[in-house]
């Protein structure tokens, strides 16, 4: 077979594209559970950081257990303040909820107790200069004083 002919070059390129495509697809599918677990742990770290557990001192492995200990109360709230049954607050995507009409939205509320005081953590999301910004703010019991905040964004400045 003459490796300098166009037929060989196109066949070789096609085979390489198919092989690499199959490998990448397989890797993406097999790594998806690990990616989702990392996103979940990072979200827990972000929420924990608002009530005094900095990310630098709370490894992801510890954040999973600590989150359950710190936030004994979690609610999915409707617009009227009533509790939405059957919905896990941690699984709520604020980006998806904001696309719904106000009457259909469900928002998470996390309640922690630290040093005998209840802290209420609420999520935030909005538009930044280059893309969406999201975060969490913890409020003291009076609901007027901010105890802590954590913000993040998807991309760097272009």
Pin down the residues of each PLM region.
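Flexible, solvent-exposed loop/hinge segments and secondary-structure transition points
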Residues: 2-158
């Amino acid at each position: 077979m003459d490796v300098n002919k166009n037929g060989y070059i196109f066949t070789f390129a096609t085979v390489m594209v198919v092989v690499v495509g199959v490998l990448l697809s397989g890797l993406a599918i097999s790594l998806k559970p690990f990616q989702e677990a990392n996103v979940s742990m990072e979200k827990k770290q972000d929420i924990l950081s608002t009530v005094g557990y900095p990310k630098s001192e709370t490894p992801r492995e510890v954040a999973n257990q600590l989150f359950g200990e710190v936030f004994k109360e979690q609610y999915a709230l409707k617009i009227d303040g009533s509790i939405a049954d059957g919905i896990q607050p941690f699984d709520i995507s604020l980006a998806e909820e904001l696309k719904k009409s106000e009457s259909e939205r469900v928002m998470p509320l996390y309640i922690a107790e630290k040093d005998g005081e209840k802290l209420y953590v609420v999520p935030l999301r909005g538009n930044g200069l280059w893309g969406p910004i999201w975060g969490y703010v913890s409020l003291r019991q009076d609901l007027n004083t901010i105890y802590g905040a954590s913000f993040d964004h998807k991309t760097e400045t272009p």
